[in-house]
Amino acid sequence: MSHANIRPAEHLAYAQRERLAFIELRVYFCGNLTRAHIERRFGVKPAASARDLIAYRALAPHNLQYSAASRCYLPTKAFRPIFKH
């Protein structure tokens, strides 16, 4: 299935879709992402940022990898945006 045909997160609340789109943009353009980035940007608690990362990884399982050495998420070589930006 082509990523272009995926309509991600239609069942999620608007606020969570915005956070998931931020996850994608941040990791794609900045090259890394931590839960703290989500927490600072949106003013959410650590549990919410963890849920957002779980949700994004469920929608795009091949886009992010966790680097224990860097303690952050990095884009994979297979990264393909799922949100229309």
Listing of model-derived features with the role each one plays in the protein:
Residues 1-85:
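Short, basic/aromatic recognition patches that contact phosphate-bearing ligands
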